[in-house]
């Protein structure tokens, strides 16, 4: 069985493909990955589940019942986190305020390998002590250390189990993948799946794990992601007792010691190119009955000059924009037919351009909260008699940067009050009538909230408001605050560039119109909003009749996630596209020949330099290194260049030699020693030089590291006085190291 995973910033989905040898029948042996809730096992999640992670111990009953079955480890579950709806419910109902119990999405924090400051906690209250227990549980506590590193990688004398759980946020990805692996292993061998897919008597084994990656993910993060997947495999195999606990797991020979074969890991395809394959396959097979030539001929643009030596009408240039929850990705792929005839034609893809920005749906949600929800709350407070409502909101929901009980309450307020309100506004906008200029949302906070916030959150807000109200005034009811929005005003604001999503969309559409594409595919949940659709139509990167909106796109019954013959949620196209890629490699798609091996990802880091503090732009005078190529074996940086520093900086990159092109943060260069900081604050200037790590004749470089540093007068600086750390959190609006969903700071002055 092959498992295909698309781990997103907001949602994750998976597809399972079984290989029955000679009995294969196209796409019949596929199933969606379904995550079962462990606290209420009668419930299954939707195939598209949220990426939120919460610590929670899996309890299946007392241990001595397990012994009666003849196995003492029948109740072992190799993971201590939950994902999906169960994690969301646990986060919504959480009462404790002592430390964090979860995170909005581990993929956002792959870069952060520093141990956490506070211990992680399970998010249920323990009966006897009435406190939340620390997040350690058998079997994983004996397989990793306090920082979340697997013990089999450490030298023998350093192998200590978990005492205080301070796992770094990057290792939470390992925890999440452990949980998904455990669920997948349970599903492929469950009775229902075996009966449905045929051959109910044969046991199933995982053969490959295929992960799709966003275009916006830099090479360094990609390597960390591969590492986390490998660690999760090792931990699950050791926790289930399939591999000796203390043995190493790195080489294929050591992996052969395990009782159950270890699956291979594959990460080559990016999400945007995979999404195109779904459209290509469906058009060729369903609409043109397998006649690929007439399909290419019908859609090729007559006004684009063909390249020399290419017959007109035998090539197609497809662009796709994928606006997800955390990243906006775009790819332009050129598809070429070889000289076959009829259905016996092979399609060869060639990736022309790809780009990704870390601004997407969640930033749109924050904009909605700041434009609509908070101003109406502020007006209601002023009407009730609060003299300085702005200051009150800033202390309650602003960015104080402290980690204390108040910070946890602030994060829970964002999760339980503001995010549901923001989602309600967005879904009303999505379903509104485009032709009605007066369409809007007129309701109170209480009408829009399906589930009321917990008493802790209500007390936190209520006490602060009661203090600020003049004495003798009636109590303020937050559920009666009116919310009045006109959608036409939102759309005008989006077109005028007052939302953060507008800039990346402008950049992407500019690139697409430069390449004269034949078709533009638009996928992702935020593209269902009338405002976003209006913006793309207004920019018109291709003629409007050549834009395909994937949420309304009709697919036939072959599509695993289809709802009433349509792609219900366009997020699933990446996983299904990767499934088609994988089947095409084994020639398991009848009447559709596709050379999938050619869609490789390339690194988009071309220009590296210091980012501006306020907005993510990289000005030409701030560029340090030009024309970097991280895919070339033996690549090096120019050793003659060195750069002056006057404080902590953020290094970012962009792909094009154009200062308007949005840049993405990559590293933080910070000064550790207090003495060095004093010298620089005086009149010293620090000079720094970078180099590439892991570059040799055969292998391309992996990442940047500090080469050396010295002061103006030539004194060398010790290596530990400076740190160059990965930090790819997109926006300077977030307090340095936390995304707004995890810090709860939604109010900006």
Which role does the model predict for each range below?
Residues 206-224, 517-536:
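Glycine-rich phosphate-binding loops at beta-strand->alpha-helix junctions
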């Amino acid at each position: 069985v092959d498992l295909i995973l698309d781990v997103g910033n907001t949602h994750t989905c998976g597809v399972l493909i079984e290989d029955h040898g000679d009995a294969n029948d196209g796409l019949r042996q596929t199933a969606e990955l379904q995550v079962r809730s462990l606290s209420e096992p009668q419930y299954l999640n939707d195939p598209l589940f949220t990426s939120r992670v919460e610590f929670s111990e899996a309890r299946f009953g007392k241990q001595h019942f397990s012994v009666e079955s003849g196995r003492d480890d029948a109740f072992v579950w190799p993971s201590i986190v939950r994902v999906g709806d169960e994690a969301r419910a646990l986060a919504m109902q959480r009462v404790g305020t002592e430390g964090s119990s979860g995170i909005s999405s581990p993929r956002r924090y792959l870069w952060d390998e520093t141990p956490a400051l506070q211990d992680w906690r399970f998010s249920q209250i323990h009966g006897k002590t009435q406190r939340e227990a620390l997040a350690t549980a058998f079997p994983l506590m004996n397989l990793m250390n306090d920082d979340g590193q697997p013990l089999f990688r450490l030298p023998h004398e350093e192998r200590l189990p978990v005492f205080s759980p301070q796992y770094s946020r990057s290792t939470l990805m390992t925890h999440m993948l452990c949980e998904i692996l455990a669920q997948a292993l349970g599903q492929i061998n469950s009775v229902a799946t075996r009966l449905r897919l045929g051959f109910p008597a044969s046991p199933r084994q995982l053969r490959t794990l295929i992960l799709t990656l966003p275009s916006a993910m830099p090479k360094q993060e990609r390597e960390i992601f591969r590492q986390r997947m490998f660690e999760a495999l090792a931990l699950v195999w050791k926790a289930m007792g399939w591999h000796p606990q203390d043995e190493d797991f790195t080489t294929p020979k050591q992996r052969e010691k395990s009782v159950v074969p270890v699956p291979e890991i594959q990460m080559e395809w990016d999400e945007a190119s995979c999404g195109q394959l779904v459209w290509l396959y469906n058009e060729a097979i369903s609409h043109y009955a397998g006649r690929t030539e007439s399909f290419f001929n019908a859609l090729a643009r007559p006004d684009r000059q063909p390249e020399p030596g290419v017959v007109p009408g035998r090539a197609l240039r497809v662009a796709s924009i994928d606006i997800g929850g955390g990243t906006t990705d775009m790819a332009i792929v050129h598809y070429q037919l070889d000289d076959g005839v009829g259905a016996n034609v092979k399609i060869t893809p060639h990736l022309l351009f790809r780009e990704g920005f870390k601004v997407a749906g969640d930033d749109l949600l924050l904009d909605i909260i700041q434009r609509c929800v908070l101003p109406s709350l502020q007006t209601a407070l002023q009407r009730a008699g609060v003299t300085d409502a702005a200051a009150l909101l800033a202390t309650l929901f602003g960015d104080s940067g402290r980690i204390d009980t108040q910070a946890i309450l602030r994060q829970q307020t964002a999760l339980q009050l503001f995010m549901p309100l923001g989602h309600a506004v967005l879904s009303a906008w999505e379903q509104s009538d485009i032709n009605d200029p007066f369409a809007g949302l007129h309701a109170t906070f209480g009408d829009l909230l399906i589930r009321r916030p917990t008493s802790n959150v209500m007390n936190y807000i209520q006490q602060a408001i009661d203090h600020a109200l003049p004495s003798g005034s009636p109590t303020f009811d937050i559920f009666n605050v009116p919310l009045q929005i006109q959608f036409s005003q939102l759309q005008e604001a989006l077109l005028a560039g007052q939302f953060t999503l507008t800039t990346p969309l402008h950049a992407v559409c500019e690139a697409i119109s430069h390449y004269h594409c034949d078709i533009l595919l638009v996928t992702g949940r935020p593209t269902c909003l009338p405002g976003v659709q209006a913006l793309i139509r207004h920019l018109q990167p291709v003629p409007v009749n050549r834009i395909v909106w994937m949420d309304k796109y009709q697919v036939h019954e072959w599509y695993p996630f289809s709802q009433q013959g349509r792609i219900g949620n366009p997020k699933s196209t990446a996983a299904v596209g990767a499934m088609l890629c994988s089947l095409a490699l084994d020639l398991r798609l009848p009447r559709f020949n596709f050379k999938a091996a050619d869609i490789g990802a390339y690194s988009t880091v071309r220009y590296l330099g210091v980012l501006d503090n306020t907005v993510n732009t990289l000005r030409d005078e701030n560029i340090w290194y030009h024309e970097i190529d991280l895919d070339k074996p033996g690549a090096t940086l120019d050793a003659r260049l060195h750069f002056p520093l006057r404080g902590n900086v953020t290094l970012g990159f962009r792909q094009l030699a154009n200062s308007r092109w949005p840049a993405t943060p990559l590293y933080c260069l910070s000064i550790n020693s207090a003495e060095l900081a004093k010298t620089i604050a005086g009149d010293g200037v620090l000079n720094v030089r970078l180099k590439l790590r892991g570059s040799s004749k055969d292998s391309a470089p992996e990442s940047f590291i500090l080469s050396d540093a010295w002061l103006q007068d030539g004194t060398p600086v010790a290596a530990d006085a400076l740190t160059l750390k990965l930090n790819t959190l997109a926006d300077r609006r977030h307090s340095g190291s936390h995304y707004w969903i995890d810090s709860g700071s939604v109010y900006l002055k």
